[in-house]
Amino acid sequence: NTAGLDDSQMVEATKGVEPKYLKDEKGNQEINPHAFLDPTVGIAMAENVTAALAEALPERAEHIEEKGAEYKAMLESIDADYREQIGALPKEDRVLVASEHAFQYMVDTYGMEQLYIWQIDTDENGSPAQIGHLVRQLKDKRPKHLFVESNVDTRPMKTVSKEAGIPIFDEPLHSDELGKPGTVAGTYEDFLRSNLKTMIAGLKR
């Protein structure tokens, strides 16, 4: 919420990140807001926020830059884990099937493919046409499991699972909000690590 803030108080956290776009069946297009699901975007965001805070608070710049470097190093470690663990999967198993096209940035970075029921959140999410399209795609793509995000209706993917004959993995992916403190997605670090753990467990044969 940026109400009441002027431009000098706002930071473009995703500065330098190439946007990716979503389209609905009618051709409407919007920027995919889920860039943060990609750890490399998290690294860029950490750099941008650290630089902006250090500039805004020069008297605390040294401390800010130190903490920013620590946070960046943590994200670089997560990025390395994503590259190693996803890279160890056979190419044909690097197919992530989820309800919405939230993981567009992440799959592009780590050499995966995402299939989905819908791209843009609308009142028609999980329509018969969308479900049928994904089921047809899954005649050729046969991942070990399908996935459902923690914040979406599970019914459309259950229909896909039944028609395609592919089970849904029992742990959800996280695509939007953090979880409550102390949960598996209670911090951004936990959020990213939880998604990697879930993906690998669900895709590895």
Q: Could you describe each region identified by the protein language model?
A:
Residues 1-205:
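Extracytoplasmic metal-acquisition and chelation regions
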